[in-house]
Regions:
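Positively charged n-region of N-terminal signal peptides that target proteins for export
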Residues: 1-5
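Bacterial N-terminal signal peptides
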Residues: 7-17
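Sec/Tat signal peptide C-region and signal peptidase I cleavage site
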Residues: 18-22
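Glycan-processing catalytic domains of CAZymes
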Residues: 23-383, 387-418
Length: 418
């Protein structure tokens, strides 16, 4: 017997009568005729568990750092040594970018002793500082640079065992010389550097409204290497508008984040939080005049969902990812599903996980960034379908209007067996 979820339409909430007292409004408590809602407390995840970072270089301005914290981030990004105190005061962590180190990491002629001397000088001030997550090394290296970057990474770990060297990789199709293909590029990185994680960037949303299938191909490739080497991966997604990339929308942010979650990612960064002073860059969370834009609220919303789902998500192990239709190259289709016999209602990405007690979990994602959609699904086994709310973190029986997904949105479901 299969467990089936059917979509039903409930009476619109607008038909309900709402009464709000001044005291309730202050506390964020709204009394409806049929239910009462209290604004939930959102606890930010630790970056060691799930990194949420505004990608780029962040000033030591107190208000700017407070805004980053309020937006749901647990990292401040890259900061110069003199700004570390401000990061600590804001309750964030950071990667330190030292001008005496990062410009020299591609210098293959520098001896190990010279590297260690520079690294020791950099880390000496911050070894016991809880706000220093690690140290910036390099962005987007080609494979021939891995060996030299490894020397710097080893020196950092030797000087400060708790520190993480930051190296971010190129996207699929842009890996450059020195590797046979993208899979080889990732494999070389994991083997040569012995890295504690994989970070990469890939921007796949365009101003004609399209989403490149390479979004999923890249996630597929990184997930395989991540699982093989038992290291987490972080994804840098599009958080501003530039070149021929799309204007920032909630649907676009939703898809990039929920797709990363469906593939088992353990970190999200947004390129960029501060708008660069160049070209057609726009729609970043903070514009060129240091004013917050509507993108800031969009980021806060999706970051809130990451932080709310996190306590459940972090207990899960990724076991499969598939597309029910429109299967991209190098990806799997519905016939690979471990838990579901049917998914209907649109074009979806589904991540499958095993949770505590061998509980089946699925994260279903609407691949349409422009339109909402209802969905239906059938589990292969019998049981009660449950949903973990992205707004409260509570897991309750699934049904009713929860069977709708916003553009790019996702839903975390599980099967409670009898």
């Amino acid at each position: 017997m299969q467990s089936t979820i059917l979509i039903t339409t409930l009476a619109a909430l607008t038909a309900l009568t709402m009464t709000v007292s001044a005291d309730q409004a202050t506390k964020g408590i709204y009394a409806y005729r049929s239910f009462q809602y209290e604004r939930p407390e959102i606890k930010t995840l630790a970056p060691e568990d799930f990194l949420i970072m505004p990608w780029g270089w962040t000033p030591g301005d107190e208000q700017a750092l407070k805004d980053i914290k309020d937006c749901g981030f647990n990292m401040a990004g890259f900061v110069t040594p003199e700004h570390v105190k401000a990061v600590q005061k804001a309750g964030l962590k950071c990667f330190v970018d030292d001008p005496n180190v990062s410009p020299f990491v591609t210098d293959g002629k520098m001896t190990d002793a010279e590297i260690e001397k520079r690294v020791d000088a950099m880390t000496a001030k911050f070894k016991d500082n809880p706000s220093v997550y690690g140290y910036y090394v390099m962005d987007e290296p080609i494979a021939p640079l891995f060996a030299n970057l490894t020397r710097w990474s080893k020196a950092i770990r030797k000087a400060d065992q708790s520190a993480t060297p930051y190296i971010n990789l190129l996207p699929i199709g842009a890996q450059g010389p020195g590797s046979k293909d993208y899979d080889d590029y990732l494999e070389q990185f994991a083997k040569v550097t012995n890295a504690a994680y994989i970070s990469y960037d890939h921007y796949t949303l365009f101003d004609d409204g399209s989403v490149s299938p390479s979004l999923y191909r890249n996630l597929e490739a990184v997930r395989k290497v991540s699982l093989k080497h038992r290291i987490p991966f972080w994804n840098i997604v599009l958080g501003n508008s530039h070149f021929h990339y799309a204007d920032v929308t909630q649907g676009g942010l939703n898809l990039q984040v929920y797709a990363t979650l469906a593939y088992g990612g353990r970190g999200i960064s947004y390129f960029t939080y501060f708008a660069p002073l160049a070209g057609n860059y726009r729609n970043a969370a903070v514009d060129q005049y240091l004013r917050k834009t509507p993108t800031w609220d969009m980021l806060r919303l999706i970051n809130s969902q990451i932080n709310t789902l996190g306590p459940t998500y972090l207990k899960l192990k990724s076991v499969n990812v598939f597309h029910n239709q429109d299967v991209p190259q190098d990806c799997l289709g519905m016939d690979s599903s471990k838990y579901l016999s049917e998914v209907s209602g649109g074009s979806f990405l589904v991540g499958e996980f095993v949770g505590p007690g061998n509980t089946p979990f699925v994260l279903i994602v609407n691949k349409d960034i422009h339109k909402s959609t209802g969905f239906g699904l059938k589990f292969k086994e019998q049981g009660t379908v449950m949903m973990t709310s992205p707004y409260t973190g509570e897991t309750k029986p699934f049904g009713g209007e929860n069977g709708w997904l916003a553009p790019g949105g996702g839903a975390m479901l599980s099967l409670k067996k009898p």
